[in-house]
Amino acid sequence: MSGFRVLDLVKPFTPFMPEVIAPERKVAFQQRLMWTGVTLLIFLVMSEIPLYGIASSDGSDPLYWLRMMLASNRGTLMELGISPIVSAGMVFQLLQGTKLITVDMSNKNDRDQFQTAQKLFAILLAVGQATVYVLTGMYGPPSSLGTGVCLLLVLQLVFAGIVVILLDELLQKGYGLGSGISLFTATNVCEQVFWKAFAPTTSNIGKGTEFEGAVVALFHLLGSRKDKKRALLEAFYRSHLPNMFQLIATVFVFLLVVYLQGFRIELPIKSTRQRGPYGLYPIRLFYTSNIPIMLQSALSSNIFIISQMLFVRWPNNIFVKILGSWDTRQGAAQLYAVSGLAYYIQPPLSFTEALLDPIKTIIYIIFVLGSCAVFSTTWIEISGASPRDVAKQFKEQGLVIAGHRDTSAYRELKKIIPTAAAFGGATIGALSVFCDLMGTLGSGTSILLSVTTIYGYYELAMKEGGFGKSVVSSFSDGI
């Protein structure tokens, strides 16, 4: 390919970029499983190591709405989480899909340059985010911390960000299973859910000593209260701490999403180059997986962050108030939207709150379902999964839809794929709303991300590890 290209700009940086060397031969499944475990262990350790030099990490968290989705843990080395990787990946996917950068993924040099450019951008994002976090006072006033401590904090965050990038690359290049992004997000969510279910810590907020974990609290209340009926009601519906109803709702959503993963349309296809039995091309209900809810969550979370920062700086400005006004709730330091655009796209914190403000609830449902459907249909166009792209792949591989002419594949796919993408995106959005209204142990977005990721790992293990029959098939057959 002749001429100058944007990707050529990264060539001078290639020798200086940290890199995981690809394996010379395919790594055995057991070894990949081991490296996945090692990667996960490193992530968990980094999530618990506090940043050295911070003065304080108390008070309202402007990134509260993004923490679980980005596998971020405040005040630790995993402060940035997977944010640099996700942001860089989405930007370059968009640039590639819209043809703003030219790259031939079948060409190894192009592919390597594209990955290097994406990695370089992720590192630059880590530097930028770390600098902004420190200078905006997330760990204390910069003037009080001093230049040396501020620089040390930035270096810690950037170093941790580079480690996460390399851990993700380690898995992506075949040493482990799946990707670091999915693994870290699912682990972070599962850790939070497990803690809220079984935490042995106690708190006293006016009703005596209570256990934080829903299951532990259930047994404690049944054992310590004489009125067992009242104890059960308290364990299932207490509002100030995780309860059993939330845990059951979380398990129900997990099973429901696994069941819905089995919904698909299977198109019979055959090869024009050789004779043989028909194959099947599956088009799933969740055609774009969890991408719609990730994009919707990223959009609303960024609105929350911008609105909250503007409100703290200019609380009386009319335009800032239109975007959103914020206030704390009783017993919590975290700020929540109380009016403006941010209020109407903020999920209700309980089913009772949803009933008390039906207009806000209706607007929120329309926003989530509509945005997920739009993001899903848009994503297939920029990610190479549109009807035209799939029809092109069929042609290149010598495949046709059984019972149709070679030239009719695009028309048949156009009838199915956009509908599946839009309906699947709206379904993901509806499940997220259901999670938020039912008060699952974690936001709707984070629960869906973890379930789809865990199921993806199950399918990968079933395919590469030689496991037996799909759980979805048996679950669907049982129902």
Swiss-Prot record:
Cytoplasmic side: 1-33, 98-119, 168-246, 383-415, 459-479
Membrane topology (Lumenal): 55-76, 141-146, 268-361, 435-440
Cysteine pairings via disulfide bonds: none
Membrane-protein topology: Multi-pass membrane protein
InterPro entries: SecY/SEC61-alpha, SecY_CS, SecY_dom_sf, Translocon_Sec61/SecY_plug_dom
Protein localization: Endoplasmic reticulum membrane
Quaternary structure annotation from Swiss-Prot or TrEMBL: Heterotrimeric complex composed of SEC61-alpha, SEC61-beta and SEC61-gamma.
Family matches, as PANTHER family: SECY/SEC61-ALPHA FAMILY MEMBER
Designated name of the protein: Protein transport protein SEC61 subunit alpha
Organism: Debaryomyces hansenii (strain ATCC 36239 / CBS 767 / BCRC 21394 / JCM 1990 / NBRC 0083 / IGC 2968) (Yeast)
